[in-house]
Amino acid sequence: MIRCYMSGSKVAGFGHQLIKALIPPPPEGPDSPQAQPGPRIMHGPDASPFQSLRRLMEDSWTPQLIETLAIDEASLPVIWDADFLYGPPDPDGADTYVLCEINASSCFAIPDEAPAAIAQTVKQRMLHNQGANADR
């Protein structure tokens, strides 16, 4: 599974984890250590294995989400995430992704790079709101 951490409309990082829920449990049983998910490996937003997913999230899917929900970009959570499974490879053999869920609460732990992205989003929103309030 790939967790795409978002701050507003920008990717703040990725978490990559082997999920074992869809494979038969080991002989030791479903509660055994062998049946538990693998560790979540955190990556920054520039991690090369996830750049196609980043482009899809920032350039296509998040703008579609904003349009579908009829909200502005500033209405997106400061920190949220979307979980993906790998889909079938495309005709060129590149990865595709299947959305599992979107989380807008309990989105921690986060990659080391994410706090800076979150702070930047908060700063931009505060400055935007400060400017909007100055017009009143």
Report residues per predicted region.
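Phosphate-binding site of ATP-dependent enzymes
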Residues: 1-73, 85-90, 95-98
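C-terminal active-site "lid" helix and adjoining low-complexity regulatory extension at the edge
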Residues: 71-81, 85-136
